[in-house]
Amino acid sequence: MNNYQILSPKSRGSFTERLEELQATTQSYLSKEAETGRQLQYSKVFLSDAQNQYQTFVETELYQDTLSQHATSIVEQAPLDGSKISLLVKTSDEQQDFIFQSMRLTEKETRATNSYVQTIALFEKYIRSMEGKGVDMKTHLVRTWIYVADIDVNYEGVVKARNDIFKRYGLTID
């Protein structure tokens, strides 16, 4: 059985204090889930300010020792409860039957480029990650999510790049 849970810190201290509380809450929750035979399969991390919080988050024990060992995506979407960080976690007693990848470009990879070039770079990174795994984009890709900063400015470049890549690999652009 699959189980989904949203975990958020209750305190309103600093981001670091909230991370410490979230670590304890998450570990407690995952321990209880393990008692029922369910293991972590996926998490989505919601940050209110990814530009300033991402590096701090990925350096935590919570991310390094737990979340990064499973399918995890990190998005900039402020939690509605004002907590600055929330987790959506999926636990299950079933075997995972899919491959999940979450990729982002480094600051260096985005410097002095536009949204078209960045989107092409992201897809090329994805395509390289499939090499030697017996999978290809046309046969095995089910869904893409691309989170775009300043969508009003960057939308056109992202869509053109995605369409160009999809056309190159024989996928439909609809």
Where are these regions (language model features)?
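Short, polar/acidic, helix-capping and beta-turn segments at strand->helix junctions
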Residues: 1-174
